[in-house]
Amino acid sequence: MSAADKVKPAASPASEDPSAIAGNISYHAQYSPHFSPLAFGPEQAFYATAESVRDHLLQRWNDTYLHFHKTDPKQTYYLSMEYLQGRALTNAVGNLAITGAYADALKKFGYELEAIAGQERDAALGNGGLGRLASCFLDSMATLNLPSWGYGLRYRYGLFKQRIAKEGQEEIAEDWLDKFSPWEIVRHDVVYPIRFFGHVEISPDGKRKWAGGEVLNALAYDVPIPGYKTKNAISLRLWDATATAEDFNLFQFNDGQYESAAQLHSRAQQICAVLYPGDATEEGKLLRLKQQYFLCSASLQDIIFRFKERKADRVSGKWSEFPSKVAVQMNDTHPTLAIPELMRLLMDVEGLGWDEAWAVTNKTVAYTNHTVLPEALEKWSQAVMKKLLPRHMEIIEEIDKRFREMVISTRKDMEGKIESMRVLDNNPEKPVVRMANLCVVAGHTVNGVAELHSNILKQELFADYVSIWPNKFQNKTNGITPRRWLRFCNPELSEIVTKWLKTDQWTSNLDLLTGLRKFADDEKLHAEWAAAKLASKKRLAKHVLDVTGVTIDPDSLFDIQIKRIHEYKRQLMNILGAVYRYKKLKEMSAADRQKVTPRTVMVGGKAFATYTNAKRIVKLVNDVGAVVNNDADVNKYLKVVFIPNYNVSVAEVLIPGSELSQHISTAGMEASGTSNMKFSLNGCVIIGTLDGANVEIREEVGQDNFFLFGAKADQVAGLRKDRENGLFKPDPRFEEAKQFIRSGAFGTYDYTPLLDSLEGNTGFGRGDYFLVGYDFPSYIDAQARVDEAYKDKKKWVKMSILNTAGSGKFSSDRTIDQYAKEIWGISACPVP
């Protein structure tokens, strides 16, 4: 049966009446057909519904663009290699305050809104916290009516879809664009040329210009981002790489040279095929650098076009106005090439001199650092940079030269430190460009993302720069959008919060959550809170059964760790703890087991395809689960489940149903973390180290409502030194857990290389760099405290309430408001 058979088609793009909305959905099913109009199944219903919602978005989006154009405010442009958007339908109707109307409209077709929203595939534009943060930030920018846009790349296959097979993790291409995305608007009128390779030409008057090589096109796709209960909708502009018809060699094709004929088209497709392509080979390194430059060049050409477009009388002499109209925020080091590219565009295209171009660039760009991990502080081979971007390499060399001269002339006391501070590392064995150093030297502001992290940046990583530019460094503790991460993903708890606070204003003013504290001992609130949590746990148990086939008990303690698999995040410690728990359960009598707190341990996250030890950890979690879950003696008291293909939509089911969440990174190594904030906001108690935002979460929720363990950040270097000197004495429980795995209790797979990373005192891949062994005993003791606390239901529910009540600080609205005032210098520009 078609949609038209159920509801008469009628275009009503702006109506909020359920009957008119139903007519508009039917209209899209009939007249924007991507499927046969003769059928209207759940998938067809999703696409027609999404296009109907897009009608609402487009009106706001156009009004916002025209308003910004007319008022010409200073605007922020957020450059990020990743955006982890999640599903858009529920978020869009929620932010537009038309959820009820769309639910009623879909009932006229016999569908539930939740079921139709479940048809949507997550946009595969990101991997982990970096991309999800960028998406939360866009939501807050729109909600705060800030003149701001996001820029990213339109990846065809994303990072990968994770499948768990007998051998462990398998990576397969994401299929989110197999049909199409109903949210994006292709902009055939927004196309910019992007050059690679070539050479630098010098004209008779000494001016330098990049020429030759190959030129591709950047084509814009716009995704409207609606604010919550506001008329503003901003843009996430995604770039796709294309080649022109002229680049197709018809003569070669007709001569049977099919691949040669379409070489440039093939190379264009590679650029936006995959997020973070493997970079072990020269080709992989070139492709990653191409991606980064492609994003920066297209975005800056677009920004400059808009700067000129908004004031047609601007001429070259007015480029000093540029920083008063444009703020560029680099999300990590991936967009660092924005610095030399802006310099190139200003000098080679617009005709500015070095000093003027440098002044404009320095006042325009700012850098957010997200890591202190050495391997994540990008360094690019000078040879690769020179080959792909010869003009940019010249500009980087000049920046490096002038920085050295500045330090030598103004800070004689720092001459001995210049080599480590330089943008270029000219080590003859491996000369590289240090991208983080380039960001610090060229940007007007550098910020960390949690108080502890920002202090480490100032006191350790960038300490020498601080003595030159003490005011350049700031902290901006990360945040999350309370719309997606409580209001929409946890409706039961949201209703309770609104009822007890007597307002739903907390959705855009999260500080109001502190009002729950005075009810923390109220028995009525306890009963409602526990019922909401149980409903979320049952929903989670159904998801686990659907995707893994494992039945879990909603009355057990749900213990969850979901994040990118990495040794510093220490999923290995989690699974060693589960192994130790299993061994102790096996040794107990049946009577003693009945006194144990039943627990379901869930782990989820993707391991990079080339990160062998991370993939071994995924395999180990699955192997332990296969044994534990099928052991009739203990599986009433312990289950271990790996949740496959972790993404935003999965998180929206896991987080509301969580009771204990593990954030157990080696202290000083997690810049912030944001999933900890999401769990805490949803009334989940955290077990964790004093790392990243954990420090501030513990301060806000109260130290009695956080299970702390492990070394502190300022102890870590000394503990590693002790290990090197053979002074570490392992706890017997740690040895017992490792030996149990080595015994073959969990199958025949050889875990020796993984376990050997925890052994010895020195050597590559040895010496327990992440201090799993040192922290293990205090981790096990903290888990024992968790078991005891969970037995006291009243105490546990109170802890849960106080976690939610203490989460107000961690709204991305607060974070973005601080960026706007203290880094970007922009103000709200609401559509009237």
UniProtKB/Swiss-Prot annotation:
Its main location: cytoplasm. Belongs to the glycogen phosphorylase family. GO terms for biological process: glycogen catabolic process. This is Alpha-glucan phosphorylase, H isozyme. The modification N6-(pyridoxal phosphate)lysine is found at residue 678. InterPro entries: Glycg_phsphrylas, Glyco_trans_35, Pyridoxal_P_attach_site. One of its GO terms (cellular component) is cytoplasm. GO terms for molecular function: glycogen phosphorylase activity; pyridoxal phosphate binding. Pfam families: Phosphorylase (PF00343). It is found in: Cytoplasm. It catalyses: [(1->4)-alpha-D-glucosyl](n) + phosphate = [(1->4)-alpha-D-glucosyl](n-1) + alpha-D-glucose 1-phosphate.
